[in-house]
């Protein structure tokens, strides 16, 4: 490749490597770059803190089009190394060149786990590693490899904190459309498909008015200390109904923080915040609940990488609802989902 660029010996793509190949297409990068919440949060965290980046060596894990690398260079970084497996890196090289930053940005094509940086340690790692439900198709395990191998003892991660939140929602119309649809498909019974539809979480934007409980943190990550095995987790939860309503699903989203900044910068992908391309994740229950304000739904959510594809997720939710009045029946379910 022209310019200040390197390519690892083992970086050739294969037809089977769909995940990395999907990031070679322009559409996904356009969607991410146009996500103002995402991109401006990174820009502000980096460029409003030049005192942290000045004369520092920075590693950009999964650099994509190079936007974060260029933010770092503009913030005063001595040199930025961007690593990406996808073929998009060829265009990133040209983008860096036309922005006259080739003298301070080196792009390397390859897997982070396999490449060798030309430096022993870096001062800062930046990465936009998050996926749906935070962990679906995420690169966090790759960021942790980079952290353990290259980050200086007093180094910084951007971002460095992440949380997943869980709440419940009323969603009768869409649940009927998504699940009930299979009972009568142009006069035919397609119900054998329903059990598979139940298992697939829906990634979509949910109106804030649908949320009818408080939220509960089910995962809280400090990227400076978290280990790969921590990404498979089991967490109890308790959420409280905020009004008399029906519950048709659980809703999850994540929040991100850059706490190393002079003024910490945060953003949320939840229904009470501005739209992001991550949207929210809906887990429909088999049973519908009738709740009254102040009543609790208690349970446990378990998440682990799927066997055979660690970027997919197996998620189990077990919950119990005990109404206050004895004439109302308790409800409990054990639900299993696959994000794929």
UniProtKB/Swiss-Prot annotation:
The SAM-dependent MTase PRMT-type domain, residue ranges: 16-311
Name this polypeptide is given: Protein arginine N-methyltransferase 1
Subunit and interaction comment: Interacts with pab2.
GO cellular component term, pick one: nucleus
Signal peptide feature range: none
Keywords, ordered alphabetically: Methyltransferase, Nucleus, Phosphoprotein, S-adenosyl-L-methionine, Transferase
PROSITE patterns the record matches: SAM_MT_PRMT
Function: S-adenosyl-L-methionine-dependent protein-arginine N-methyltransferase that catalyzes both the mono- and asymmetric (type I) dimethylation of the guanidino nitrogens of arginine residues in target proteins. Asymmetrically dimethylates the polyadenylate-binding protein pab2, modulating pab2 oligomerization.
Any one GO MF annotation of this record: protein-arginine omega-N asymmetric methyltransferase activity
EC number(s) given by UniProt: 2.1.1.319
Localization per Swiss-Prot or TrEMBL: Nucleus
BP terms from Gene Ontology: chromatin remodeling; methylation; regulation of DNA-templated transcription
SUPFAM superfamilies: S-adenosyl-L-methionine-dependent methyltransferases
Pfam family, one: Methyltransf_25
Modified residues (Phosphoserine): 176
Binding site for S-adenosyl-L-methionine: 29, 38, 62, 84, 113
Domain of life: Eukaryota
PTM-bearing positions, type Phosphotyrosine: 19
Primary location class: nucleus
Enzyme class: transferase
Active-site positions on this chain: 128, 137
């Amino acid at each position: 490749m022209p310019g200040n660029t390197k390519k690892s010996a083992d970086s050739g793509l294969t037809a089977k490597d769909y995940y990395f190949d999907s990031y070679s297409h322009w559409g996904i990068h356009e969607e991410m770059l146009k996500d103002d919440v995402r991109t401006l949060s990174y820009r502000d965290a980096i460029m409003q803190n030049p005192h942290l980046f000045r004369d520092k060596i920075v590693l950009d894990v999964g650099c994509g089009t190079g936007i974060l690398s260029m933010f770092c260079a503009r913030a005063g970084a001595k040199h930025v190394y961007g690593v990406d497996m996808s073929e998009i890196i060829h265009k990133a090289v040209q983008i860096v060149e036309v922005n006259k930053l080739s003298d301070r940005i080196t792009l390397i094509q390859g897997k982070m786990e396999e490449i060798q940086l030309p430096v022993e340690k870096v001062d800062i790692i930046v990465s936009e590693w998050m996926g749906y439900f935070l962990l679906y198709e995420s690169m966090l395990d790759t960021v942790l490899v980079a952290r353990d191998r290259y980050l200086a003892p007093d180094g910084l991660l951007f971002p460095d904190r992440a949380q997943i939140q869980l709440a419940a929602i009323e969603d009768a119309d869409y649940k009927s459309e998504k699940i009930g649809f299979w009972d009568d498909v142009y006069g035919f019974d397609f119900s054998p498909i329903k059990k598979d539809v139940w298992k697939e979480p829906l990634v979509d934007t949910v109106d804030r008015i649908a949320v009818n409980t408080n939220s509960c943190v089910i995962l809280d990550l400090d990227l400076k200390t978290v280990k790969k095995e921590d990404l498979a987790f089991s967490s109890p939860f308790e959420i409280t109904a905020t009004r008399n309503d029906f519950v048709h699903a659980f809703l999850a989203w994540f929040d991100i923080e850059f706490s190393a900044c002079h003024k910490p910068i945060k953003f949320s992908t939840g229904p009470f915040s501005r739209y992001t391309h991550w949207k929210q994740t809906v887990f429909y229950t088999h049973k519908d609940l009738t709740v009254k304000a102040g009543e609790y739904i208690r349970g446990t959510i378990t998440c682990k990488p799927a066997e055979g594809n660690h970027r997919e997720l197996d998620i189990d939710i077990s919950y119990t609802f005990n109404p206050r009045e004895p004439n109302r029946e308790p409800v409990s379910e054990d639900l299993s989902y696959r994000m794929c």
